[in-house]
Amino acid sequence: MATVAATTKVPEIRDVTRIERIGAHSHIRGLGLDDALEPRQASQGMVGQLAARRAAGVVLEMIREGKIAGRAVLIAGQPGTGKTAIAMGMAQALGPDTPFTAIAGSEIFSLEMSKTEALTQAFRRSIGVRIKEETEIIEGEVVEIQIDRPATGTGSKVGKLTLKTTEMETIYDLGTKMIESLTKDKVQAGDVITIDKATGKISKLGRSFTRARDYDAMGSQTKFVQCPDGELQKRKEVVHTVSLHEIDVINSRTQGFLALFSGDTGEIKSEVREQINAKVAEWREEGKAEIIPGVLFIDEVHMLDIESFSFLNRALESDMAPVLIMATNRGITRIRGTSYQSPHGIPIDLLDRLLIVSTSPYSEKDTKQILRIRCEEEDVEMSEDAYTVLTRIGLETSLRYAIQLITAASLVCRKRKGTEVQVDDIKRVYSLFLDESRSTQYMKEYQDAFLFNELKGETMDTS
């Protein structure tokens, strides 16, 4: 009798590729400085602007040492000279532990809250509080879990949990909630777990090495750890880092913590903030908390009006003020809300408090290097001649325009089944998409055909 072997079809497993969005400054990893705060010509995505990066490195070092809280720095320069890039480099160099808040000057204007409230919230987002607390935990390897269910099917479950370390073994009685937590986390014999005595939270650390041969096959997420040594009950110091704004929101209303996720914070009363400041100061004196002055970055700062600048003057003198970094591309222009002109559109009394860092236009060599970095970031292969043409376009028009042509040229190259962007691809997208100067020239030629044209033979100011 012939037997037919059943064949099982194994489904094909495909690797899921994580896609990350490519932003204008996603290639920046830091300021590109060495240990002596000397900038390298091209490092960590930063190119050129050596003097500005050196100055930013000095500011960065003072922020790390906590010696510059309440100071303000202005990065001033022409459009497309890397002002925002320097600020983003500082944020990357500071790391995740130091709060960094970035806003645009026009973000503070809202119908829902006042300008000063928006600035206050931005300031308090940029100040972190590192709170230390000691908790008692039980850490050990699960030897056995016994759960007794009532014979009638009704009533509460009871059980026993046996935990061990290399030196001791103990049996714990379990209540209904702990049994539910163990079942939910799928805890079984051989798992190494920790139980927070205050909250009852159970955390799985992994499987014990002694149980490595229990199963023939295990998933890639299975982690093996050593069996804990010493006592089962231990005291552990836990550090929480939150911003002052998060504490404000939680204490401002009954369901304040929900507002953190919805973003509907509204205006917060000054009395609430004063109470929180007093409590944080008390924790600081007792050694329970530590203040971390962070960084608030305001881009396009010339968009603020005279009332906002007046508020900044006062806020910088506060004992809980972050480092304020501002960027502007304006020269001598009118202060918003007044008829007076001032350098960068900022009042003189605030300019007097600022450390001003200037940026200069990129050279041809730097422009070419930046375009190479952007091509690597966007996975675009380009010929040397195409780099030269694109660099010339960047120098004659703007660096931003040249960077935007990279993706468009790559798409044109793929459509013709090419693997490397050539000069013809650059020329084609250059003819399809106008830059600012060619667009202005086009409008001047056909000004009578446009609706509501106000030029009337006058020279158009495009500065």
From Swiss-Prot:
Positions bearing N-acetylalanine: 2
Domain of life: Eukaryota
Binding site for ATP: 77-84
Organism encoding this protein: Mus musculus
Principal place of residence: nucleus
Protein name: RuvB-like 2
Gene3D superfamilies per record: 1.10.8.60, P-loop containing nucleotide triphosphate hydrolases, RuvB-like helicase, domain II
Gene: Ruvbl2
Signal peptide bounds: none
Top-level EC class: hydrolase
Keyword Metal-binding: no
Recorded family membership: Belongs to the RuvB family.
GO molecular function: ADP binding; ATP binding; ATP hydrolysis activity; ATPase binding; beta-catenin binding; DNA helicase activity; promoter-enhancer loop anchoring activity; protein homodimerization activity
